[in-house]
C-alpha cells in the first residue's frame, strides 16, 4: 500500500477542480492505496501557506505523487513535482 499525494491545477478552475481531485482520490483508494487529497487538508490563510503545507506533506508522507490533467499549467503542481523528484518519490499521471 502506498500513500499517494494528488497534485493538479486549482486556481482559476470552478470549485478549485474539486471534482477531479475527488475522482482521483476514489481511483487511488480503489487500487488499495491511501490518497492525500489537498481538498481535505485544513484551511489556511494564504496560497503560500497552502503550498508550504503541501510540500511538507509530500516530503514527509508521500510514497508517490499523482498528477492530474493540466498539472503542467499549475505553478503549484510544478513545485510539488520538483519536490517529489528531489526526494526520489514515484511520479504517476492519473485521469
Segments (PLM) and residue ranges:
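Conserved catalytic or regulatory cores that recognize and/or transform ribose-phosphate-containing ligands
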Residues: 1-95
Amino acid at each position: 500500500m502506498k500513500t499517494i499525494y494528488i497534485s493538479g491545477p486549482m486556481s482559476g478552475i470552478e470549485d478549485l477542480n474539486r471534482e477531479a481531485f475527488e475522482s482521483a482520490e476514489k481511483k487511488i483508494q480503489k487500487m488499495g492505496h491511501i490518497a492525500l487529497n489537498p481538498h481535505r487538508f485544513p484551511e489556511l490563510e494564504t496560497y503560500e501557506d497552502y503550498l508550504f503545507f503541501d510540500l511538507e506533506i509530500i516530503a514527509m508522507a508521500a510514497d508517490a505523487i499523482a498528477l492530474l490533467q493540466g498539472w503542467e499549467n499549475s505553478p503549484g503542481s510544478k513545485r510539488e513535482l520538483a519536490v517529489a523528484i528531489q526526494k526520489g518519490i514515484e511520479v504517476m499521471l492519473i485521469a
